[in-house]
Each structure stands twice: as structure tokens, then as C-alpha cells.
Amino acid sequence: MRLRRKPWARPELAACDFYVDDPPSYKGRWREFFDNSNPIHLELGCGKGGFISELAADNQNINYIAVDIKSEVLALAKRKIEKEYKERGIQEIKNIRLMSHNIELIDNMLDTVDFIEKIYINFCNPWPKTPYKKKRLTHGKQLIKYKQFLASGAEIWFKTDDDGLFEDSVKYFEENGFIIKYKTWNLHESGFGENVPTEHEIMFSEEGIPIKFLIAEYKQKIHQAVCIGINIKEEN
């Protein structure tokens, strides 16, 4: 569904203390920008902010970078974050940075020294037609870029409603040196206890669509033979 243009969105973001206007200018300097040594987590495609607002408010000791390309949704995310923090009595929003950026060019704004420890990819476009599959946020083309700035032992948490995308994504991760630590074809029936639901997740669940979820771990310079014998926990 196309989001209507909101004339107030860009001016409101420009006045926001936790909005970053020029993300590439901080490439290699995100820890300096947050002004602390806390871990940095990244959400690709933050949408209206329901997920990141709750997650960041729950984890004040973690820094979060939330990326989307549309100012209209980022402005809604900004308001959602402010509302969540206010309701919890948190005076300042110090551990979130919102920004508009093309995720296909994510390596333009993050570098090896940024050491991202976790990436969240929630309900991205499945791009089901073969000519467009390279646009998937879990495609090998993208994973190669993520590996440039992931810390060793970093994780990617991936959720989707799309069976084909999920099945293909498992292959993408395995082909690019990731270990699948956890995988379920029905997250809400799996007993997994660390889930923060997104707006899309709630909508799909109400329609009876099972939510697929995995955690993929990246180990730098890991030899493929090390993967042999690794136990993969899977819930059916």
C-alpha cells in the first residue's frame, strides 16, 4: 500500500535530535557518534517504528540504528519512538538514530570498524520474480555487504510471512558463511521467548499466516569445515 506524501514529514525529521540527515558522513564513526562503547544493532526497514521503539526502550544499554528510505514512514517512526519513551518515563532518547538511506547501498554508511553486533530484517519485500530476487535484503549480494561491517559472532534476526523467501534465505545464509542457530516455520507456536512483534507481524498473525523466523550467526574467517557437527536448533 502506497503511503501518501506528508508535507510535514521532512521538516519534522530535520528538527529531530535523533534523526541523522547524512548517514554516509558517519561511516566508521558510529561509536563516536553515540558517544559510548555500547553494542550497536541495526534494523533494516524500520517502517513506522513499532518494533524499534519497543526494543530500544527495553534495552537502554544498546545503541540502535534504524533505517528506512521513506521520510513519511520515518516521521511516523519518530513519533512512535517519542510516544513509547514518554510513556515509560524515559527523559532522553539517546540510544536510537533514525535515518533515510537506500538499504541496497548500506555499505556506503557502515564500515568494518563500526562492528555491528546484530541486524534485524523484518518482513522485507519478498521480490518473488527471478529477475528481482537480487533485491532481497537476505540475498547473497546483500549478505556480502553486511559482512563488511559485522562483528565476529554477530547475528541476523530475520522474520517473514513468505514461505519462498524464507526457504531461499536459509540457502543464502548458508552459502555465505553464516550458521543457522535457530529456525522455525511458526514463530508464535515455537516457544521462542525474545520476540518483539512488528505491525506487519500482528496483521499477518490475525490472518492466520504463520511467521517464519531464523537467527543466522556470522563468524569472521571461519573455515567451512568448522561448521560440520554444529547443532542447529529447529522448531517445526
Curated annotation (Swiss-Prot):
Keywords: Methyltransferase, S-adenosyl-L-methionine, Transferase, tRNA processing
PROSITE patterns: SAM_MT_TRMB
InterPro entries for the chain: SAM-dependent_MTases_sf, tRNA_(Gua-N-7)_MeTrfase_Trmb, tRNA_methyltr_TrmB_bact
Catalyzed chemical reaction(s): guanosine(46) in tRNA + S-adenosyl-L-methionine = N(7)-methylguanosine(46) in tRNA + S-adenosyl-L-homocysteine
Binding-site residues, S-adenosyl-L-methionine: 43, 68, 102, 125
GO CC terms: tRNA methyltransferase complex
GO molecular function, one term: tRNA (guanine(46)-N7)-methyltransferase activity
Key word Metal-binding present: no
Record function comment: Catalyzes the formation of N(7)-methylguanine at position 46 (m7G46) in tRNA.
Family: Belongs to the class I-like SAM-binding methyltransferase superfamily. TrmB family.
Protein name: tRNA (guanine-N(7)-)-methyltransferase
Encoding gene per record: trmB
